[in-house]
Amino acid sequence: MFSKATLFFTAAVVIVAAGATPTTSQCNTGPVQCCDHTQQASGPTTLTGIGEVDLGDTSTLIAYGNCSPVLPVLGGPKCQGQTVCCDNTEFEGLVNVGCTNVAV
């Protein structure tokens, strides 16, 4: 009887933990992205490996480099860069503009 109760409790904990897995629903404009680089921008900005990008007079967080969607896979690869949610992608997909940091 004791082993059945332990098994039931363990299964319940696993089910609750699986339901608590972070999701990417924190971003209303698309998937949460994992990007190699982020930088606060204001006016013309020089980005490592890309060159100068004119963002006008906006003061915004930009993400650039290798950006890929963060997938909520239990035990999957972790983001080694910065997780961000961006309003749009500009400059032929090289730079994501209007980003905010996201805790995943």
From Swiss-Prot:
Task: Tell me the superkingdom of the source.
Answer: Eukaryota
**Induction per the UniProt record:** Expression is induced by natural light and low temperature.
Name the SMART domains on file.
HYDRO
GO MF annotations, alphabetized: structural constituent of cell wall
Q: What's the main place this protein lives? A: secreted
Q: Where is the signal peptide?
A: 1-25
Cellular location(s): Secreted; Secreted, Cell wall
Listed InterPro entries = Hydrophobin
User: Which keywords does the record carry?
Assistant: Cell wall, Disulfide bond, Secreted, Signal
Under Pfam families, the record lists: Hydrophobin
Listed disulfide bonds for this chain? Answer: C27-C85, C34-C79, C35-C67, C86-C99
Give the record's GO CC terms.
extracellular region; fungal-type cell wall
Give the family from UniProt: Belongs to the fungal hydrophobin family.
The UniProt subunit note reads as follows: Self-assembles to form functional amyloid fibrils called rodlets. Self-assembly into fibrillar rodlets occurs spontaneously at hydrophobic:hydrophilic interfaces and the rodlets further associate laterally to form amphipathic monolayers.
User: What is the protein's given name?
Assistant: Class I hydrophobin 12
Q: Which organism is it from?
A: Pleurotus ostreatus (strain PC15) (Oyster mushroom)
